[in-house]
Structures are given as structure tokens and as C-alpha cells.
Amino acid sequence: MIRIRRGLDVPIAGAPEQLIHDGPRVRTVGVLGPDFLGLKPGMSIQAGERVAKGQTLFTDRKAPGICYTAPVAGRIASINRGERRALQSVVIDAEGDEEILFDRVEPSDLDGLTREQVADNLQRSGLWVAFRTRPFSKVPVPGSVPAAIFVTAIDSHPLSANPAVVLRDAHADFENGIRLLGRLTDGRVWVITRPDAGIPAGTGHAASFAGPHPAGLPGTHIHHLDPASETRTIWHVGYQDVVAIGRLFTTGRLHSERVVALGGPRTRFRGAIPRGSEGLAEALLARPELARRRGEDAALVYLLGR
């Protein structure tokens, strides 16, 4: 175990009680351009067009093999651009249940997949964009091989969901995802948790961190365990994305469901962790749970302002 001694746990009232329930029906989702540094999108859709879950919305002109896909089926409500036509968001009004199916593999055959087969399925499904590189925090270039991959199964942000609770019924998918990550690197797949979290590392290499924020940040883990450099690239990925990767390969379907923590001093029902689709509008998720004063707002992730 590595203990972080310098840091700060921000004292904010209304911490979640770590009870998961289904959130309200998703009506609007968005894929945000600023989430992807250096993105030069080539659009595959236009406003008003119907899309299926898993359908390509756009690709990166600098890396055409990577697809950015729809997390839900529905109709493209708007494509929003900013200065110099930089993509701000693609907004989808959710309706219907059409979906694109991807390659399916029996769990017993996952270890027989080649690096190219794993990468191709991830890139076509849109799950490749869950990876980030260190340094530079960009989506990895197709064909690149990281020196190691870090799975962040710990969260030290204030009012965050407990990864152990979120993963409680998804251990098999999580371990399958870790097996698949092992096909993408010749180095270690690090699985980072809190001490005694009870989260299985599977075929990965387990390590634990304790202490205040930033004990849960991937940059902290990489710095202490397997430092990156300009010539040595490390990837990191979130634990819920690893579950989605495991389910993609064993079911052939894109898993876009995510659990987020909803808390804070203005929440009416403190402790709810709604389950909703990736990319859903936070205001739609939070509105039934909040009792806010005029002129005030609530943030789902305080330290990021989002």
C-alpha cells in the first residue's frame, strides 16, 4: 500500500450513502468535443438524422480508425460548434432501442484474441476513446502499444461513488475487461484500489493507495508505480469503462450505462447514486433530487466544475 500524506479531502455536506438505484428515463445525451484533446472530427451524421446505439457519430481526421459512437438510440437534436468551428457537442434526443452489434467472443476464448482483434473491436464500438495517455492525456493513436495500463478503481473526489459498491454485481465483466487490456500491452495492467476494497484484480497487478485527494487520481498512481515520459507512454482507464469492455466482447453489445454520485448540501435525498446512460444531461438526472435556492446550482463533480 502507498499512503499519500499531502493532499486535502474537501469537507462538503451531503455525502452519498452508496445506494444504487435506477435514475429517471434518459431523454437527452451529449457527446462533448472538449473531452477529447486535439480532436479534429469528421462528421458521419447530421442534425435531424436517426442513429442507433453504437452507430458512428464522427471520427478523428487525424486517426480515422477511431469511432466516436452514440451511447443511445435516437435523433440528432443538434451539432454545436464554437470558435473556429471546434466541436462542442453532439446532442441526441433518446428514442427507440435500435443498436449496432459488434463481435462477440466466449469468455473462455478471450485470451486467444490478438492485440489487433481487441483494438479493432474497441475502435469500432467507440470504447477505445475511454483510454487516455500519459503524458498529454489524449486518446491513444491506433497501433500504439503502451508500456503499461492503469485501471483506476478508486475515487478520492468529494461526494464520489464507492467503486466497490458500483462493481459489486459486475466482478466477472470487470475481470474479463482486465484480461482484454492485457492483450493491448506487453507490460503490466495495474488495478488500483483502496486498501481492503474487495475489488478483484483478476489477471492484473493489484496495488492500493490510501490518504486524501489526490490519492485517487491516475497521475498519482503512475508517478509512484510506473512513471511515464516523452518516450514511455502509459494508458489509464476508468473502472466502469473496463466493465463496458468486458461486456462488449462477451455480449457483442455496447454497454453505455454508468453510475454517478449525486450529493451535496442542496440535495433533498442525500445518498442516491442514480444509474443512467453515459453522456446524459446532468440537469435531467439531478432535477428530481434537488431542492435549490434561486441563483444556486449543483455540480456532480465539485473539483472539476462539471
Region annotations inferred by a language model:
Residues 52, 72, 238:
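A cytosolic small-molecule/anion-sensing beta-strand core signal
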Residues 65-81:
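Short, compositionally biased
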Residues 56-65, 83:
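Short, charged beta-turn/beta-strand-edge "cap" motif at the junction between a beta-strand
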Residues 80-303:
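Buried, small/hydrophobic-residue-enriched core segments of structured protein domains
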